[in-house]
Design a protein with these regions (language model features):
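Active-site nucleotide/adenylate-binding loops and adjacent lid/helix of ATP-dependent enzymes
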Residues: 4-5, 90, 105-143
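Short, small-residue-enriched loops and turns at beta-alpha junctions
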Residues: 100-104
């Protein structure tokens, strides 16, 4: 199996370490990777947010599976991009679609989801720089 792992953090290092142990692995590419990931596969200069570049790499290198580590490509819709592309839709990409990724990528979205579905969670409110005074009041009320 030929695997492309997107990301450059500690999470991706752990993924690379474990994937490299598989007897099914033919090649592991990590984009962009880090000093630790290079011990387990080949780091490549590829921006995980450049979906067209990811597509080209997947097709040119006969990638069988893509694993997305960081939230940002998922929140920006890389899974949706793969599923809507006729050349990529049969290449498994591990990670949620854009809407599902919002649960991790947006705390405001996640909290609203939890309240809407009666999932126990701590009290919260969302503030901006324009409503900072309201934020201070909210925090004072939490004491």
């Amino acid at each position: 199996m030929r695997v492309l792992l997107l990301g450059s953090g500690g999470r991706e290092h752990a993924f690379a370490w474990k994937i490299a142990q598989s007897s099914m692995l033919e090649a592991l590419f990590i984009a962009p990777g880090n000093a630790g990931t290079r011990l387990h596969g080949k780091n490549i200069q590829l921006d995980p947010l450049d979906f067209q570049a990811v597509k080209s790499f997947v097709l040119e290198n006969n990638i069988n599976m893509v694993l997305v580590g960081p939230e940002e490509p998922l929140v920006k819709g890389i899974q949706d991009f793969f599923l809507s592309d006729t050349e990529l839709k049969n290449v498994p990409l591990i990670g949620p679609d854009k809407i599902g990724a919002q649960l991790e990528g947006s705390k405001d979205f996640a909290k609203k989801f939890m309240f809407r579905h009666n999932i126990p969670t701590a009290k919260y409110a969302t503030f901006t720089k324009d409503t900072l005074v309201n934020g201070y009041s909210f925090l004072e009320a939490m004491k």
